[in-house]
Amino acid sequence: MKKIQISPSILSADFSQLGNEIKRLEEGGADFIHVDVMDGHFVPNLTIGPPVIKALKKNCSIKFDVHLMISPVHKYIDAYSEAGADIITIHPEATEDLSNSIKKIKELGKKVGVSLNPETKVNVIIDYLDKIDLVLIMSVNPGFGGQKFMPEVLSKIKELKKIQKEKNIDFDIEIDGGINFENSKIAIEAGANILVSGTTIFKSNNGAIKKNIDLLKSS
């Protein structure tokens, strides 16, 4: 079994203190910083552009796990790579040529992730699983933080684990959306090894980030 890693979503951070919030995550044992990038078009919200990521990366040694919810995604891959993204995750619905976008991210020396919305089936990406580093399973409809976890997506994680075994391929399975101390356990049991969490990490136990990260890791 892979080591459980935590990728806190800064969508739930105090944006007026973003640099300090990332420092707290680093000190609290976060494995990645999860950055949700939204364009108001592919999803109904607007968030973080490349200059913000570039500024935040200057004083941070943790890898940036950048989730691009933008369309057309291909034209923005270079900008987010240059800004400091270490992992770039894209949606198959947001690119005209998923194979080409995966290739571009790899050529830039970045790890590549592909995200599945709650309604997107695993077979959409089955031919690409040997070319990617990570599959991100969305357990809410993307666009806003603080939504309720959708347990029905766990079947996709189990399906991915089965494919890994049958085809002898390896990639991380990340889950994002409504993750808390209760459902993190069933997500891990299903086969997820990276948990994205925002509200639980920043708001639970009076904002005790280290405690909250430790609790999620030991689910």
How should each PLM-predicted stretch be described?
Residues 4-9, 33-35, 56, 64-68, ...:
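Hydrophobic faces of well-ordered beta-strands that scaffold small-molecule active sites
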Residues 105, 188, 202-219:
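C-terminal helical cap(s) of enzyme catalytic domains, especially alpha/beta-barrels
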Residues 33-50, 92, 140-146, 201-204:
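Glycine-rich, proline-tolerant flexible connector loops at the mouths of alpha/beta enzymes
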Residues 18, 25, 36, 80, ...:
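Conserved, mostly hydrophobic/aromatic
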Residues 28, 59, 83, 108, ...:
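Structural motif
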Residues 22, 74-82, 120-132, 177-195:
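Catalytic cores of alpha/beta
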Residues 17, 59, 75-76, 86-172:
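Conserved anion-binding
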Residues 41-73, 77, 184-200:
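A short alpha/beta connector and helix-capping loop motif
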